[in-house]
Amino acid sequence: MEKGYALTSKKYRSVYEIVATETPGIIKHMKKILRYSQKDGECLEQERDVWELDKFEFPLRSNPIKNVKTINFKGISQITIRKEVKTVIFMHLKYMAIGSIMAEMVATKRFCRYLALRYPKIISLLDLTRDIMESYLIYLQTEAKERKNYRSDLYGLRRVIEDVGNHYDRQDIKNLFISTDFPSTPRYLFKFYSDETIKKLNENIFQMDEQIARALILHQLLGTRISDTLTLKTDCLSIRENRYFIRIEQVKSITFEKAISDEIAQLIIKSIDYTEEHYGKTKYIFVKKEDPLRPFQYSMLQHRVMQMIRKNDIRDENGELLNFGTHTFRHCYGKKLTEMHIDDWMIARLLGHKTLQSVHHYRKIGNKIMADETRAVREKIDMILMDVVKEWDGYEI
């Protein structure tokens, strides 16, 4: 309408220095009223265009620290493709993590937008050809700017397309992709914080809300993923042979135990006591104030830390405002283990890895530090050797 309410609005988020697009409050309330007024009828949840995940009766593999409530298929404009994708995603809900399914949805919606623009006559994934897929691969490499690497994106898209083929008994769909379609895994060096940066961060973390501070300090001391720290349960501690052990139930991987110091155990006990005093008996140690049945949400923790960084003007070694990431603490933990000359299997166990596949990344961090710290000495030795070589008769450099 010409003078109606805007469906979106712009809001400057000073913490991240970005202008975000969001739905105005009045529109959110109107949508809630509309959904409430609509009759359920005989329509199954998996037939709707927006699925409310709590309406499915089977258990879902969700990440407790991420607040995913719905799966929205409206971004797929092709009606037949939308139906096909719904069928596959419903199957995936039975055994895949919600995070992986959301990644599939992002990849599929991106592909469907491309089809609508370049191949509007394609109305079903069963109509795809190898030529269309090759054109899409070229588009990703030359025009798409949404991410640096589309490897995982393409794997998610392939799962959806091939499972559509399996469901409709079209085995030829599996020939749409070949192994060389997928970009190689990007080579990168893990980021980490210097000891000075960690010191600055912790000095200010200690001034934050006490339970948030405990969560962040434990996160550093345990070397876990942030999802594993925030989902620590109140019964995670045990004592064997006069030593404390902690049970870590990894959201993304295996459950494992490791020994911890008395100091770390006391910090955990203090965190449990705080939660019990304020919220009673709970499942998780670090709980959401508005809903103690749920753990701290990652978005809340990230926002609070970014606020603290801006307020206290914490900067990195290059003078830039610190770019905070909780996983960097895990990198620092792994780096310290390599510097202690611990063998790879022990490092993998302490990090909760099932294999040695990722340990070499932490070794690279350690090697880089060694190179940086010894560069001045090595350059001085090189200069001495160069002077000696120059004095050799008949020797050319």
Regions found by a protein language model. Name each.
Residues 229-230, 324, 334, 341-353:
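Active-site-proximal segment of tyrosine recombinases
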Residues 53-73, 169-203, 247-254, 286-295, ...:
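Flexible interdomain linker/hinge and immediately adjacent N-terminus
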Residues 1-176, 204-207, 217-219:
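Charge-rich, intrinsically disordered N-terminal extensions
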Residues 249-254, 351-382:
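Catalytic-site neighborhood detector that most strongly recognizes the C-terminal catalytic loop/helix
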Residues 222, 232-267, 357:
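Conserved tyrosine-mediated DNA breakage-rejoining catalytic core shared by Y-recombinases
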Residues 272-275, 279, 375-397:
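C-terminal secondary-structure termini that scaffold catalytic or DNA-interacting sites
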Residues 196-226, 330:
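Basic, Lys/Arg- and aromatic-enriched nucleic-acid-binding interface segment
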